Amino acid sequence: AGGAAGEEIDRYDPLLGSPSHALVIASSREHRPGMLRTIEEIHMTGPNDVPDDDIRSDLTFFETPAGGAVFAAGSISYAGALSPNGYQNDIARLTGNILRRFIDADPFTMP
């Protein structure tokens, strides 16, 4: 089974528009050589084998002023990590907890 972070990863970064009150639930680190930042951040060519702490996938959560909330998986590969072991794994459990809270009628409150 693959991991929850693969190609097309996104990270929490207030300088790029992430809400300052967002909670980073988990992060992937130490990706394989050749992984890149988001395309919007690549302004020139250069070596891609230099360690870069900004190459990561962040699972984030934040509340909105209207009583809603946002969960961002941080990677297109997240969905592929749900089914291993018959959905009996940490990613499936985390996702289930998030979905149960999202269908709850109680509004979220801003911190």
Predicted features by range, described:
Residues 1-111:
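Extracellular ligand-binding/catalytic regions of CAZymes and related secreted enzymes
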